[in-house]
Amino acid sequence: MRRIVALRRIIWDAAGHFNDDDGWAMASYLAISALMAIFPFLIFATTLASFLGAQAFAETAVHLVFDTWPEQIAAPIAREVVTVLTVQRGDLLTYGVALAAFFASNGIEALRTSLNRAYRVVETRSIWYRRTQSLGFVLIATIGFVVISILLVFAPLIARFLEANFEWIKPYMGTITLWRFIIASTVIVLGLVAVHIWLPDGRRPLLDIVPGIIFTLAGWLIGSTLFATYLDNFSSYVTTYAGLASIMIAVVFLYIVSVIFILGGELNASIRRYLDARAKVGA
């Protein structure tokens, strides 16, 4: 009974603060910022990958970003992304690519702002530190994607070698699609851990952010599945928005994702507040 009461208090605190502190508006801000950051990030990443010799990066990047999205949502956007990424561009250090990196970092700043609100902290770090950190996130993500794309190029060769020399491993190899999904899911988990630890002001132990990350992953899975089912069976987006349907679908999907992401931070903050209150009472 005590656990039920505690769980209810935590959920009520998280949901109440989300509602009272403009959580719905912050989710809109985060969704639009994410949509505006995806294309600049992929343009910057593709240009850097080409500079480093990873010519097949565009297709791999699209898979890594969109493999975990429902197909009904990802397919129209992925086609446009591939079209954008296959356009030939100039050298790495052009103004356009530098601006792409800057606009991509705006998405990181949106994550920071929403998490600061969720964790109920006031930002104390300088704008230069924050911008440098955001650009660092973009650069690290880009390098990570390049490394993964190179590994996926060699994956079939490695798989054939392992299957030829280790018969017992065949049932566990799966398909390239499966491995892409596993890698994309791993990238998401590591990304969530990184943004919860380093983006908001202050410091939080790893154990403090685990509940919110689990909630976020479960919420994204359930939310995307329900939205995909809705699109399959009930949606009139195509007739209502015509050529804008794919953009509207992406915006609504990212809004759902953003609400769940912010609620994950709210949940972590509420659990910490509850535990701190219990500790004071015990003292």
Name the predicted role of every residue range:
Residues 1-283:
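Membrane-embedded alpha-helices and immediately adjacent juxtamembrane helical segments
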